[in-house]
């Protein structure tokens, strides 16, 4: 219970409505001290300050209150990927997967299904729960978390190659929302951008990404953009590199840090071999190439010459020890 005697909600910042640019005020306005501490950890995480986020959330890893515990495990788990603390990440994420007792409230079961699914899907691993198991409990969560749940389900559809359904899930959530929840909306616009890129609707992908950036930039929310780099298939380069060079550099630094730790869990647990020795530019070009883009199309999208694309892809083949585009698929994100 919080200081008002009401049940706490997990990820209190994600659940707080505020206008972009007002995140610090939103955190300060949370009355309950423990919920405010979690919101502080969220703000640090989404700003790319993984070490400080983990430090702020760590005291709640064994909290009796499930809202505080799930929040802390989720924040510390993903922050530990960027910090290359893989045993810590595994411990935190494993704690999320532990099912609550049957006698717990529907709200607790809803938050468990959501965070257990998110902990798996965001690592591109199979979710322990289906959407059908979540739907009857969804109404027990606040709107900010329901929006995040829509992102998790959209991401799962994307991983199954159901790009149209993934896009519909994200866009419907954005259309139907009532309040302004920048964190969850950022997740959803990035998901929609991913789906549009895979459907080769570049204009729609850019529109969603530009909206995501308009949400992220006022509060410095670079972490999620960096984490989604490979799945955004060149949108970061196309939309930010020239106009926002300093922000772009920070985002790419975030990408390298997070993706290194992410692969330390994803690759052994999935049996896949997502490449870990490519630059972000090489990885993006390789992602587009294995999706059937021509060198000329890749060049136009990324603002370089076809010759540059050809040379970069030749370097990719050499690093991966392969000789054809068909062989790229085994080393790329889905």
Segments (PLM) and residue ranges:
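Solenoid-like repeat scaffolds
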Residues: 24-32, 58-69, 95-107, 133-145, ...
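Flexible inter-repeat linkers and adjacent short helices
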Residues: 1-70, 222, 234, 241-245
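Tandem amphipathic alpha-helical repeat scaffolds
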Residues: 2-9, 34-48, 70-85, 108-125, ...
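Helix-turn-helix repeat elements of alpha-solenoid scaffolds
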Residues: 4-24, 42-58, 81-95, 119-134, ...
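Linker/hinge segments immediately adjacent to helix-turn-helix/homeobox DNA-binding domains
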Residues: 130, 145-185, 189-280, 296
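Helix-turn-helix DNA-binding segment
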Residues: 263-314, 318-334
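Small side chains
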Residues: 57, 77, 170, 286-289
